[in-house]
Every structure is written in C-alpha cells, then in structure tokens.
C-alpha cells in the first residue's frame, strides 16, 4: 500500500504547467537532487530516483522547458534486486540550462539559494515549492501520526529562502531547523499543511488530508469526553464509598435512630443507593427534592459524627 506522501507526490507529478513554471519546478529539482558528471568527455546533469512517477515528471519538465528528450536509464538495485532506480540524464545544453535556471554562473559559481526571479514571483514560487517537495519533501499521514511536513535542504540559505517564500506569499508559518549535514524547512500545524498542499497543486490530497484531520480531531474529542466522564464516575464512586463507610460506622456504634430525622433519612437512602451522584441524591432523597448544597451539608454532618465516633 502506497504511503500518504507517495500519493501526494503522485498527484503532483500529473499537473500540467506552462514552460516558465516548468523551469521554476525544474530549478528546484536540479538544485536539490542533480549531480554534475562527466561521461565520455561530456558534461551531464544526473538525477536519480526510485519513484517512476518522479522520473517521468523530470523527463517531462525538461522536454517542456527546453524542447528535447533527456536520457532515461533504468537499473535494478544490486542489494535488493527488486527495486528499480531511474536515472534521468541531461547530456545537452548543460551550461545553458544551469545558467538559465541560475544554478551556476561563471561569476558566482554554484548558486545555492532560490533565484530572485523565482523568489519575487508568487506563481513561480508555487512551482518551485512543488519541485522542492517532489525532490526531498515528506508529509506524515494525518490519520496515524503527528502533523508534520518537511523539505530537506543541503544548504542552510536554501532552506531559509524556502521559509521566506512560504511565509511571505502563503502565510504558512514555516520553521527551519538543522538536520544531518543540512537543514529542513517544516510545518507542524494541520491547517498550514493543508494550505501548503493546496499551494503546490495537490488539491485531492489536500481534501483527503482535511477529511482525515477532521475525523481524527473528532475521535480525539470523543476520547477526551469519555476520559472526563470516566474520571467523574471514579470521583463520584470514591466519594460515595467514603460516605457509606461513615454511615455504616455510625450505624454500628450508635445506630441511625438517634440522628435527626433528615440526617437519618439521607443516611438510609445513601446506604440503599451508593451508586447515585450528589445531584441524583438531591433529586431522589425521600424528604426531597432538595439542593445539592443541602445534601452536601447533611453528608458533612454525618462525616463529623463518624469522625467523633472513631
């Protein structure tokens, strides 16, 4: 069974985009996952993934943005012998693509942050976030786990740029923290995770997320009510047991007849009905109904008498 995160990514790979937005999404993929290699004396950009849908997505983005088909090489992992690896190799226009996507320039070298033309465009930022999530993002199943969505970045300034566009344009309250030779930008609030899914275009996943979140919150509310009721029942039962103990002591030491009639009446009724709450006692006592405070006052009197007899 596919994970929730896999279902989200599968939906994202089916979104059709304009060539300029394809470039923004591709810029995130290449910046976060590509390796610059040399084969047969020629430079290439290699992106490796185990997800066939993501491999097809990268292939499609390159074709949409630059008009040619990259190489797609499928290999089988040696250790497991059942999982395939997909290598998308860009072996032409490498320098032009890296310059166009602002991944590398002769003056600046490798550029690790989000390019300004993306950072200052809300529409391109949406596509860049989609590429970033597909490249190295994950989201927990809202039904079974704590709410958490994250995107891993190798470079701290890249995660800070992602945080900036997430908060500036989409009010996602994203946070950044250091993580294993890199950092992550993450969301913890259920509402903000739903908003992020909508921003990057995973509308069906967002609706499923909201349904699961609502069901989970309802279950939690019911559990809290049940726990509260159980605690109240225990409290009532404990108080009733102490009251019965007091009355039985009075009955054993001196009997109930010497008591004032109202106290004796309540004492006998409590012995007969140890399961009743204070409210129920007040409503059903033979000389009632009386107020809860009235019942409480009589029970305190009985307790004082029992204490004097101990």
From Swiss-Prot:
UniProt keyword list: Cell cycle, Cell division, DNA-binding
Gene3D superfamilies: Homing endonucleases (3.10.28.10)
Alphabetical list of InterPro entries matching this protein: Homing_endonucl, Sporu_reg_WhiA_N_dom, Sporulation_regulator_WhiA, Sporulation_regulator_WhiA_C, WhiA_LAGLIDADG_dom
Disulfide bonds: none
Annotated DNA-binding residue span(s): 277-310
Residue stretches in coiled coil: none
One term of GO molecular function: DNA binding
One biological process term in Gene Ontology: cell division
Free-text function comment from the UniProt entry: Involved in cell division and chromosome segregation.
Family: Belongs to the WhiA family.
Name of protein: Probable cell division protein WhiA
Organism of provenance: Lactobacillus delbrueckii subsp. bulgaricus (strain ATCC 11842 / DSM 20081 / BCRC 10696 / JCM 1002 / NBRC 13953 / NCIMB 11778 / NCTC 12712 / WDCM 00102 / Lb 14)
């Amino acid at each position: 069974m596919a994970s929730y995160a896999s279902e989200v990514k599968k939906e994202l790979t089916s979104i059709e985009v304009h060539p300029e937005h394809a470039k923004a999404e591709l810029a995130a993929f290449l910046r976060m996952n590509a390796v610059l290699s040399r084969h047969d004396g020629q430079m290439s950009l290699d992106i490796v993934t185990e997800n066939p849908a993501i491999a097809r997505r990268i292939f499609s983005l390159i074709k949409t943005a630059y008009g040619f088909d990259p190489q797609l090489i499928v290999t089988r992992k040696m250790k497991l012998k059942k999982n395939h690896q997909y290598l998308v190799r860009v072996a032409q226009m490498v320098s032009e693509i890296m310059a166009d996507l602002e991944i590398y320039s002769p003056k600046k070298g490798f550029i690790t942050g989000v390019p300004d033309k993306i950072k200052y465009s809300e529409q391109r930022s949406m596509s860049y976030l989609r590429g970033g999530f597909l490249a190295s993002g994950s989201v927990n199943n809202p039904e079974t786990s704590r709410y958490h969505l994250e995107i891993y970045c190798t470079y701290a300034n890249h995660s800070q740029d992602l945080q900036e566009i997430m908060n500036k344009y989409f009010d996602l309250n994203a946070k950044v923290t250091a993580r294993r030779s890199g950092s992550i930008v993450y969301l913890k609030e259920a509402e903000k995770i739903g908003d992020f899914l909508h921003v990057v275009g995973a509308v069906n996943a967002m609706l499923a997320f909201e349904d699961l979140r609502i069901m989970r919150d309802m279950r939690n509310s019911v559990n809290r009510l049940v726990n509260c009721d159980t605690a109240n029942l225990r409290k009532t039962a404990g108080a009733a047991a102490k009251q019965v103990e007091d009355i039985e002591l009075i009955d054993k030491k001196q009997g109930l007849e010497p008591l004032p009639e109202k106290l004796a009446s309540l004492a006998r009724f409590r012995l007969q009905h140890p399961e009743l709450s204070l409210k129920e006692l007040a409503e059903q006592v033979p000389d009632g109904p009386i107020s809860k405070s009235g019942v409480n006052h009589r029970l305190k009197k009985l307790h004082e008498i029992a204490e004097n007899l101990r």
